[in-house]
Amino acid sequence: MNEVLAKGKKAKEIARELVLKSTEQKNEALSAIADQLILETAYILEENKKDIEEGKAKGFSDSLLDRLMLNEQRIVDMTEGIKQLIELRDPVGECVSAWERPNGLSIQEMRVPLGVVGMIYEARPNVTVDAATICLKTGNAVILRGSSSAIHSNKAIVAVIHRALKQTSLPQESVQLIEDTTRDSAKQLFTMNDYLDVLIPRGGKQLIDTVVREASVPVLETGAGNCHVFIDETADKQMAFDIIINAKTQRPSVCNAIETIVLHEKWAEQYGSELFSSLKKRGVELRGDQKALAMDSSIVLASEEDWGTEFLSLTLAVKLVSSIEEAIHHINTYGSMHSEAIISENEENVSKFFVSVDAAALYHNASTRFTDGSEFGFGAEIGISTQKLHVRGPMGLPALTSTKYVIRGNGQIRK
């Protein structure tokens, strides 16, 4: 039996044990993991350094190296996310709804774990911690399959998690890592319907599209983040500048950073040149339409491909429009249904934007950078769903549960 199949079979067995664990037992395990991560920070960083050095040797981009990199603060941030998770209410066993039928049957809809969660992801080793802990909190076994670029970091983190779980009542194999990072292991994971209840891809568009196209296992799609900010003609200048600079430059390599600004022509006539200059001073490369080029000759002419690209770098597309309807059309045409924002003082336009734009998270006068489980108060997240079935947006605890109906009677039979 190969590695993927063996770990799938084991996860199915473990899932039946985890469903019996109490909230207290699960929280004790999470606390142990947080403590062990701090205790073994030096070991994790040493292994992460190997991934970084190999990445540099292979010519990885700065944005990819940033997603790959761990440091003491990022590990502290992981543990803070776990502590938030401990404080959150355990959804397992929660009564979603209850009612009584005329025949005396009492019906309850109860939250239950999904069972076995498969997680396939790229680069970011912090996802290893997020996925493991949020699955444990919700009573799910998890099989992790990271990329070859982060294999040293992922193996170290899972080893640390196993050492933590050894001190608790939860089985070490509640969290398993597929160490084979070849395409064959991924393809096998795609079709493990007998063992996986759901598969969650988290990474670039190519990975996500491949999983959605090839998997026979049910998929919770976490989409790429081709996010936009629309600056309406009534937008406050300083607010617009602050939001765009934050949403693009604070951390350009993440999915909730913006990739296109859509400017109303009337606003751009007054403030566009100054905004472009401010962005360029911060190292942002601008790619715009002909109207943007007419305002600033240093802007590169955008290609059709640019409008649909998640750059994950200091590259920003610029589109000028004459109306909110044109802005909405552009966003719905090229957006990835992740996060979209409008900066405006016109409530009618804001309402139109919220009703018409199709995305998991919509913002008025705020940065798209807040689309994140911790910022939403969910604790660690397992991803940001851009699909419409089961769950949408940052996926916190309830996203990793299903429901079942519990019916109590006193001898009723159907007539």
From Swiss-Prot:
GO BP terms: L-proline biosynthetic process
SUPFAM superfamilies attached to this UniProt entry: ALDH-like
CDD domains per record: ALDH_F18-19_ProA-GPR
A cellular component annotation (GO) from this entry: cytoplasm
UniProt keywords, alphabetically: Amino-acid biosynthesis, Cytoplasm, NADP, Oxidoreductase, Proline biosynthesis
Keyword NADP: yes
Disulfide bonds listed in the record: none
Reactions listed under catalytic activity: L-glutamate 5-semialdehyde + phosphate + NADP(+) = L-glutamyl 5-phosphate + NADPH + H(+)
InterPro entries hit by this protein: Ald_DH/histidinol_DH (IPR016161), Ald_DH_C (IPR016163), Ald_DH_N (IPR016162), Aldehyde_DH_dom (IPR015590), G-glutamylP_reductase_CS (IPR020593), Glu-5-SA_DH (IPR012134), GPR_dom (IPR000965)
Pfam families (UniProt xref): Aldedh
Chief place of localization: cytoplasm
GO molecular function, one term: glutamate-5-semialdehyde dehydrogenase activity
Localization: Cytoplasm
EC category name: oxidoreductase
Residue ranges of the TM segments: none
Pathway: Amino-acid biosynthesis; L-proline biosynthesis; L-glutamate 5-semialdehyde from L-glutamate: step 2/2
Keyword Cytoplasm: yes
EC number: 1.2.1.41
HAMAP family (UniProt xref): ProA
Function field: Catalyzes the NADPH-dependent reduction of L-glutamate 5-phosphate into L-glutamate 5-semialdehyde and phosphate. The product spontaneously undergoes cyclization to form 1-pyrroline-5-carboxylate.
NCBIfam families, alphabetized: PRK00197.1, proA
Family to which this protein belongs: Belongs to the gamma-glutamyl phosphate reductase family.
Annotated protein name in UniProt: Gamma-glutamyl phosphate reductase
